[in-house]
């Protein structure tokens, strides 16, 4: 009888793992903005993610003003296959705060600002020990970074990443030919 239960538990585990790793199931990027002023930049990320076949959810919460809201959002998605993308200008506490409170990948993608000569980027670079959000500038590159993470598990996403890279190479060759 104990062998039967053990076999049954193994089958349940196998079925659960197969469901979990089914192509594309549950994979999404959760874009957390520090404020509504980050919405246009976040929409660019979401648009590029759609090109890779990746769903995006956009949320607004501030590590400075509403840290409890940030924690609620993290908890809401903690059991899913997600990559968090944090978008916060000025003083970017959001990226480190999210990373310190999740085991999921966090990509910090602060929008560029001419104010302060772009120096606000430094708040995204230096993090305390044990806090490691990945810094990726530009909306398209942030989406590509998310896609590469999901490509580890999803062949369809991997193929789209490879095609994207090939298209970028073709653009260079074409630009060179046009100059000749």
From Swiss-Prot:
Enzyme class: lyase
Pathway as given in its UniProt record: Purine metabolism; IMP biosynthesis via de novo pathway; 5-amino-1-(5-phospho-D-ribosyl)imidazole-4-carboxylate from 5-amino-1-(5-phospho-D-ribosyl)imidazole (carboxylase route): step 1/1
EC number in record: 4.1.1.21
Protein residues bound to substrate: 35, 38, 62, 65, 89, 91
SMART domains: AIRC
Any coiled-coil regions, as ranges: none
GO molecular function terms attached to this record: phosphoribosylaminoimidazole carboxylase activity
InterPro entries: PurE_classII, PurE_dom, PurE_prokaryotes
SUPFAM superfamilies: N5-CAIR mutase (phosphoribosylaminoimidazole carboxylase, PurE) (SSF52255)
Gene3D superfamilies: 3.40.50.1970
Keyword Lyase tagged: yes
GO BP terms, alphabetized: 'de novo' IMP biosynthetic process
Swiss-Prot/TrEMBL keywords: Lyase, Purine biosynthesis
Residues that span the membrane, as ranges: none
Record carries keyword Lyase: yes
Function: Catalyzes the reversible conversion of 5-aminoimidazole ribonucleotide (AIR) and CO(2) to 4-carboxy-5-aminoimidazole ribonucleotide (CAIR).
Family indicated by similarity: Belongs to the AIR carboxylase family. Class II subfamily.
Protein name, UniProt field: Phosphoribosylaminoimidazole carboxylase
Species this protein is from: Archaeoglobus fulgidus (strain ATCC 49558 / DSM 4304 / JCM 9628 / NBRC 100126 / VC-16)
């Amino acid at each position: 009888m104990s062998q039967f239960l053990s076999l049954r538990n193994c089958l349940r585990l196998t079925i659960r793992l197969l469901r979990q790793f089914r192509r594309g199931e549950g994979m999404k990027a959760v874009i957390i903005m520090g404020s509504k002023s980050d919405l246009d930049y976040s929409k660019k990320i979401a648009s590029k993610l759609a090109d890779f076949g990746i769903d995006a959810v956009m949320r607004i919460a501030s590590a400075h003003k509403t840290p409890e809201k940030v924690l609620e959002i993290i908890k809401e998605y903690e059991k899913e296959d997600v990559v968090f993308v944090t978008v916060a200008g000025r003083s970017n506490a959001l990226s480190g705060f999210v990373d310190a409170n999740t085991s999921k990948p966090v990509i910090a993608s602060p929008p560029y600002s001419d104010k302060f000569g772009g120096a606000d980027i430094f708040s995204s670079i230096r993090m305390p020990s044990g806090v490691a959000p990945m810094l990726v500038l530009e909306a398209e590159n942030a989406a590509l970074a998310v896609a590469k993470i999901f490509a580890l598990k999803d062949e369809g996403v991997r193929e789209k990443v490879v095609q994207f890279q090939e298209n970028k190479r073709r653009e260079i060759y074409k630009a060179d030919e046009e100059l000749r």
